[in-house]
Amino acid sequence: MKEIGKIIRERRKSLKVNQLELSELAGVGINTLVAIARGEGNPKLKTLLSILDTLGLQMTIELKS
């Protein structure tokens, strides 16, 4: 979760969007967003996908080799 949080933080900063703006655009609570960005908590997949989509990111699932 920490790696995802780091990616979210870096992308948000590169887009020059603050946490409150991102939480509103993604339709998630500010406390939820802050926890995810810190690599904490256990967010619902729907919440995580909403944040990623808002940032222009996507999550990929691959088979182990």
List where the protein language model places each region:
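Short basic helix-loop element that most often maps to the first helix and adjoining turn
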Residues: 6-21
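Positions in alpha-helical segments
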Residues: 6, 31-34
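Short hydrophobic/aromatic patches at helix-to-coil boundaries
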Residues: 2-3, 60-65
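Short alpha-helical DNA-recognition segment
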Residues: 17-32
